[in-house]
Amino acid sequence: MSNTETRPAEVRCGAPENGTPAAGVEILTARDVPLGGPRAMTVRRTLPQRARTLIGAWCFADHYGPDEVSRSGGMNVAPHPHIGLQTVSWLFSGTIEHRDSVGSHALVRPGEVNLMSGGHGISHSEVSTPDTTILHGVQLWVALPSEHRDTAPAFEHHVPAPVPLDGGEVRVFLGSLAGDTSPVGTFTPLLGAEATLAPGATVTLDVDPGFEHGVLVDSGDVRLEGTAVRPAELAYTAPGRGTLTLTNEAPAPARLLVLGGPPFPEEIIMWWNFVGRSHEEIVRAREDWTKGDRFGEVHGYDGAPLPAPELPNTPLKPRRRAR
């Protein structure tokens, strides 16, 4: 999914500050972001924000739906570019058709992951299929480390098997959890998994204590380490925990995502659909997209590519790190 804001702000994401991580659970609330047009979808964005810009290398999290396609028109994101990141698409309902400039043509369905590596430059389109009535899912981005940010663009698709737990199940789409490991490739250690909890269940997950973690709740009355996390909120825990204890106090099943990774040691600039290290790198990527260079062509999409928004009048520069 593209960041289709017409005036996207730059976000400078800083390396972790020295010192002992704060204990407890930090709750990050989402902001509503319309994706353009009077009938367009509105997403709930929890990353990046001023309170926290990264969880591991996870740098972007949009949560959308359940969205009635008959009212909103569904998803129709024209070809657009990416550099310096990987996109991760995960659905709860509906189907999205993916096309990209390396020739990939794939469908993503509930319980399946599409991972696209932008690297030096890729373009793609995303369109909900005609048979989709309800569209519901998440779009996530992962920042690539400096030594891999110019890697060749690529695409992977994987269908993780459900792993039963006492009180629920997980599907691991990136990294390792509950004895299962995803084969999907990443350039930094990461965790990405969907978990469902039975009504009234408490589940304790063994996790890497070197990771910071985020729990994004989709549905249910969820508590993480005793702290209430409402739907659409993202709960953060600092490194140092070897377990995450999740409870569903609702009379219906709960669904959530568990994200994680070691603190990302680099500063990055995010603007529009680009992740870079400097103002000049972002400017060059925008110019290349406008000229039709570098990003290839998406075949099979009926429509024009997305135009790049105007850059701000001042150079993209660091923002003060809140934490």
Which stretches of residues belong to each language-model region?
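Jelly-roll (double-stranded beta-helix
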Residues: 1-323
